[in-house]
Each structure stands twice: as structure tokens, then as C-alpha cells.
A protein has these predicted regions:
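Non-catalytic DNA-recognition/assembly elements of restriction-modification systems
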Residues: 1-9
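DNA target-recognition patches
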Residues: 11-43
């Protein structure tokens, strides 16, 4: 159903804060069901890095509490020269999903409980990429995914509008 990929690797602090490329930050993945392209930072890139694409899913791999492990974020648009931070891993599906559906189902309580169960650690928690890939999610027809995804995207939009008041 897809393959995993790593975030940035082999970087030093001198590579960050400048450069023609951008990367999706840990907080972007942690905070947003759909990647926010305004929450990217500059990085100097070499040839051996993985570009992100529309449809990719990102997961945080480390946190201070089990409840915050494995937060997910979906890349819902195309962007050039964009990469993933080194504290996350990516998943590139080979099947077609409604991206809004995927974004919200991966943050639903049932999926989050699976992630919490997989958290390993005492003062710092980590998660196994291989174990995450074993988790099953409900996949209705694409048409139904689209309806559910649109519903939650609209609901999220209404909540955002209400919070601005």
C-alpha cells in the first residue's frame, strides 16, 4: 500500500536557516492534520534527501509523553524543493486516498490510541516505524472517503472561524 522514507539526514546546524530548499518542521507535523506551507524553514540540501510530494503522510517519531507520539500530517498540495524534518518519517501511499479523510482518520481517537499503545520509553518516548505501518485503518470507498473528508474539513473551517471571533 506504500513505502516509508526518512526525513533530513546528515545535516549540521550550519545547513539550517538558509538555502533554496524548505523543510516541514516537527511542529508543523505535530500541530496540523494537513501540512501548512507557511510553517516551513530554509535548509541547504544535498542530493541524498527525500523530497515530499502531495499525498505523503508524515509521523512524529519522538515525544516527551506517550499521548503526543506519532502525530500525523498529510501533504495536501504540491510544493517544489520541500523536505521533511529529521524527527519524523514519511509514508508515501501507492493507493489513492481522499487526503482530507486520511488527515482526519489518522488523528481520530481510535488511531491515536493505537499510537499511544506503541509508544516506548520512560522520560522520552519513541515509536517504531515498522509497528506504525502495521496499524489498520478503515478505508471506505473513495467516494465515501471524499464525503467524510469534506465534512471534517468544513467542520474544521467553521471551528477556525468561530475561534477568530
Amino acid at each position: 500500500m506504500g513505502s516509508t522514507f526518512t526525513g533530513l539526514s546528515g545535516k549540521t546546524k550550519e545547513d539550517f536557516g538558509h538555502g533554496k530548499a524548505k523543510f516541514i518542521t516537527y511542529m508543523n507535523v505535530f500541530s496540523n492534520p494537513l501540512a501548512n506551507l507557511d510553517m516551513t524553514e530554509s535548509v541547504e540540501i544535498d542530493l541524498n534527501q527525500n523530497c515530499v510530494r502531495k499525498g505523503d503522510v508524515f509521523f512524529t517519531t519522538s515525544s516527551e509523553t506517550p499521548e503526543e507520539i506519532g502525530m500525523s500530517c498529510v501533504m495536501s498540495e504540491n510544493a517544489e524543493n520541500l523536505y521533511l524534518n529529521s524527527f519524523c518519517f514519511g509514508y508515501r501511499p501507492t493507493e489513492k486516498f481522499d487526503l482530507n479523510y486520511l488527515a482526519y482518520v489518522l488523528r481520530a481517537k481510535t488511531f491515536r490510541n493505537e499510537m499511544i499503545f506503541l509508544a516506548q520509553g520512560i522520560s522520552r518516548y519513541n515509536i517504531s516505524k515498522n509497528k506504525v505501518m502495521e496499524i489498520k485503518i478503515s478505508l471506505p470507498s473513495f467516494e465515501e472517503q471524499n464525503k467524510v473528508g469534506q465534512y471534517f474539513a468544513h467542520l474544521d473551517h467553521l471551528i477556525t472561524l468561530h475561534q477568530r471571533k
